[in-house]
Amino acid sequence: IFNVEDIENEEKNANRDFDYYDLQLQAVRQALSRFMPEFSNIRIRRSPLRMDVDKRINGNKITLSVNQLSDGEKCLMAMVGDIVRRMTIANPQLSDPLLGQGIILIDEIDLHLHPLWQRDVVSRLTETFPNCQFIISTHSPHVITHVQKESLFSLDITADGLRSEHPQKSYGMTAERVLEDLMGLTTTRPVNIKNEIDDIYQRIDRKEYDNAKKAIF
């Protein structure tokens, strides 16, 4: 983005055309605005050399260095910028590279992301790049519960090789239910706590109410 912005500024000055914009850089700005609407006006500062961006927090707009953002925010910005760059190269004939077609593979989309971002990342990708097909891997229940079962594949390695199947349900499930029903966790609690709870229920089943009460308190 440093070099591209330099070229954009040189063209403006050389041609005295201050409405000129670089197509690739403009596409990056547009994609970030769609994908991360709380951010705007990403730009380069020369003294000291850095990349700044405006972020709206609780209704107030503040300017931050990109280095001040969380790892998740930086990863998402880098990912979106890289997709746009590749879309621009692959579709030079399009006035809007974000409408280009492509197949995009992303491994472990949830890495470094806050649960709020894990929840929204797939829908924001498909809204920002509507003509692209995304093949995404994840271990996050927050991602899975926001994907329709027809678009979700559970992969398991068996003695016969790799098995792929749609779950019976995914969209709208709680994170705990996804972990237990789709990802094989027997409990989301610490194992020792689960064992203690099971022991209490067993005492109640045996009508050992006093012992059960002592175990609780």
Map each language-model feature to its residues:
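Residue-level detector of alpha-helix boundaries and kinks
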Residues: 13-17, 64, 163-164, 185, ...
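Charge-dense, low-complexity intrinsically disordered segments
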Residues: 15-22, 112, 187, 206
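Switch/communication elements of ASCE P-loop NTPase nucleotide-binding domains
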Residues: 52-183, 192
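Phosphate/oxyanion-binding loops and surfaces in catalytic or ligand/nucleic-acid-binding neighborhoods
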Residues: 34-38, 86, 150, 185, ...
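Extended helical coiled-coil dimerization/tether regions that scaffold
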Residues: 1-74, 81-98
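Acidic, Mg2+-coordinating catalytic modules of nucleic-acid enzymes
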Residues: 167-217
